[in-house]
C-alpha cells in the first residue's frame, strides 16, 4: 500500500496513522511535513529532522519518499529523498525549479527493496526528455509536488503512464491522483492522508514485429 501525507508533522503521522502502516508499505511525504533541511548539519548529526524518519523506516521496514527544501550552504534545492529500510539511498533535486532554487542536472532512479523507483520533483514530470529512466523500466513512478493539484502535471503523468505501461502516482499538497497503466485517472483522494493500491503491471502496449527504420524526407524543390 502507498500512504501519502501532507500538511501534518511527522510525529503526528506516527501517532495517528502508525497502526495502519505495515512492513513493505511505501510512504510519501510532501514538502511541508519536514520543511527546510540543512543537509550538512543533518548528515553531520547536528540536527535530527531526518533522523526520526530514517529510524522509523528501519523499524517498520518501509520505504519513505520525502520531499523537502534542502539547504547546502547558501543554496536551496527543491528535493526529494528516498529512504529504504533505514538507508538514505539518495536525493533527487528538481531539474527545472522556480526562481530562488538551484537546479540539478541529474535525474535519479532508485533500486529499492521493492524494485526500481522513479521520482519526479514538481514540474520535472512535464519534460519528456527527463523520462528516460522510467522508460527503461521501473516498478513505481512517483511525482511529488509542493503545489496544489495541477492539471498540466496530471496530463503529463497520464502520458508517461501510457508510455511506460506503469501506474503513476502524483502527490500534491491537497490531494493525490493515481493513474493506471493506460493513462486513466483511477482515483483522486483529498486530505492530509490518503492511501492507494498500485498493482504491478506489465502493460507495454502493442509491439510491431521486425526491424523498423525511421526516415526523414526533405523537399527537393
Give residue ranges: language-model regions.
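Amphipathic beta-strand/beta-sheet edge segments enriched in Tyr/Trp
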Residues: 74-93, 175-191
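Active-site beta-loop-alpha substructure in enzyme catalytic cores
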Residues: 2-29, 101-164
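Active-site beta-loop-alpha junctions enriched in small/polar residues
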Residues: 7-8, 69-71, 93-97, 173
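Short, structured patches in soluble enzyme cores that scaffold and shape functional sites
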Residues: 68, 82-84, 93, 121-123, ...
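C-terminal beta-strand edge segments of enzyme domains
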Residues: 102, 109-114, 173-221
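Cys-nucleophile CN-hydrolase/nitrilase-fold catalytic domain and related Cys-dependent amidase chemistry
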Residues: 9-85, 149-166
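A short, sequence-level motif marking secondary-structure junctions
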Residues: 94-98, 124-125, 191-194
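CN hydrolase (nitrilase-like) catalytic-core segments centered on the catalytic cysteine
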Residues: 44-65, 130-197
Amino acid at each position: 500500500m502507498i500512504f501519502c501525507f501532507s500538511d501534518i508533522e511527522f510525529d503526528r503521522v506516527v501517532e495517528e496513522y502508525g497502526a495502519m502502516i505495515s512492513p513493505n508499505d511505501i510512504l510519501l511525504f510532501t514538502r511541508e511535513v519536514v520543511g527546510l533541511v540543512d543537509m550538512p548539519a543533518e548528515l553531520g548529526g547536528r540536527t535530527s529532522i531526518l533522523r526520526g524518519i530514517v529510524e522509523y523506516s528501519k523499524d517498520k521496514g518501509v520505504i519513505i519518499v520525502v520531499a523537502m527544501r534542502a539547504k547546502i550552504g547558501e543554496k536551496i534545492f527543491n528535493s526529494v529523498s528516498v529512504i529504504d529500510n533505514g538507508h538514505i539511498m539518495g536525493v533527487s533535486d528538481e531539474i527545472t525549479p522556480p526562481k530562488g532554487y538551484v537546479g540539478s542536472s541529474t535525474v535519479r532512479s532508485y533500486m529499492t527493496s521493492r524494485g526500481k523507483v522513479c521520482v519526479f520533483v514538481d514540474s520535472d514530470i512535464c519534460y519528456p526528455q527527463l523520462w528516460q529512466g522510467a522508460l527503461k523500466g521501473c516498478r513505481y513512478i512517483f511525482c511529488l509536488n509542493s503545489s496544489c493539484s495541477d492539471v498540466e502535471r496530471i496530463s503529463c503523468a497520464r502520458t508517461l503512464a501510457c508510455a511506460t505501461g506503469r501506474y503513476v502516482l502524483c502527490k500534491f499538497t491537497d490531494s493525490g491522483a493515481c493513474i493506471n497503466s493506460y493513462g486513466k485517472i483511477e482515483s483522486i483522494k483529498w486530505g492530509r492522508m490518503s492511501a492507494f493500491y498500485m498493482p504491478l503491471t506489465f502493460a507495454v502496449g502493442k509491439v510491431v514485429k521486425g526491424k523498423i527504420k525511421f526516415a526523414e524526407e526533405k523537399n527537393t524543390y
